[in-house]
Amino acid sequence: MGWKTLDDMDLAGKVVLVRVDVNVPMENGEVTDATRIEKIVPTVEDILKKGGKPVLLAHFGRPKGKVVEEMSLRLVLPALQKALPGTKVSFAADCVGPEPEQAVAAMLEGEVLLLENTRFHAGEEKNDPELAAAMAKLGQVYVNDAFSAAHRAHASTEGLARLLPSAAGRLMEAELKALEAALGHPERPVVAVVGGAKVSTKLDLLGNLVGRVDHLVIGGGMANTFLVAQGIEVGKSLAERDMADTAREILSKAKAAGCTIHLPLDVVVAREFKAGAANETVETSACPADAMILDAGPKTVAALSEVFASAKTLIWNGPLGAFEIEPFDAATNAAALQVAQLTKAGQLISVAGGGDTVAALNKAGAAEGFSYISTAGGAFLEWMEGKELPGVAALTV
């Protein structure tokens, strides 16, 4: 591992600046899902146990360098206090300057301080060295626990990390270890499942994966584009016909790299995209001209079952069908439950990420069974694309 963790740092009596992700959904000024807040608790508690004083830095929404009251982190304070019962959590109405400096000076051991939205300063998203230096003045150690913001080179994620002794927080550490196990030095064979609507949004991902995995399963709307590239008609299905040449390039790149690509063998088609729509299962080559492909069929699921059973590592990003609408969630559900089963039996290391993916695995009741579920979205995708993440690179020893 090329980065320090909390275990490597002497925090006793030190002010620890912790970059966290508390970008939670709100309704009428109330937090509707506190998952991201709950995930930072182990890091905050470990810093407190080591005698450090945690000062939390975070962004909230997109205020574009201006103060926007509805995007004040003050709104998150009650949910944060609830997640840390028995710990006094205070708030400072800025993240640099006299107000946070005084609030930090007044902190007692065992207390936590939340600073105002870093994006209220235009310099945050520009990675302004002056803003990073003003933040660095507040503490002696920097901890990044926001993997989800690590793909952005901002003042609080990258600039600050280069000015103070730095380490990964517990959530960041867990994420990096899981991704290292899945793509860095994985146990082989490695299977990647990539679904979703469009090839165009996942070009870099597919291009990187064919050179790094043994099997690539392509599902969802993007599978239709690959079928079109092979001369198969897909009726009224979602397909990016202008991406057919690109799909053929990916297929030949995979062949050259010894990566087997798995496309649907049979498909579930319907004439309407709605819950409970009349549907039928047909061979992939037999999609009626007036129908659309909305899921992979049982033959495909059975074939994938064999691929999964032979694998040691699996990475999943994107559903295999239109999982939001029953019965077109069947292939995603069946595949996800099998991965969870193999993982629980100790036969597979499974890592999944991306918004739709997490929703699909939760819907299938399979999320708990995976080795690791990343909530990072864009950062998870960029890591899978093989890109260097500035927030992680800045922590590298």
Curated annotation (Swiss-Prot):
| Kinase in keyword set | yes
Q: Which Gene3D superfamilies match?
A: Phosphoglycerate kinase, N-terminal domain (3.40.50.1260)
Write out the GO MF terms.
ADP binding; ATP binding; phosphoglycerate kinase activity
Q: Which keywords are on file for this protein?
A: ATP-binding, Cytoplasm, Glycolysis, Kinase, Nucleotide-binding, Transferase
Broadest EC class assigned to this enzyme: transferase
What is the protein's quaternary organization?
Answer: Monomer.
Family that this chain belongs to: Belongs to the phosphoglycerate kinase family.
Could you tell me what this protein is called? Phosphoglycerate kinase
Q: Which organism is it from?
A: Cereibacter sphaeroides (strain KD131 / KCTC 12085) (Rhodobacter sphaeroides)
Recall the taxonomic lineage recorded for the source organism.
Bacteria, Pseudomonadati, Pseudomonadota, Alphaproteobacteria, Rhodobacterales
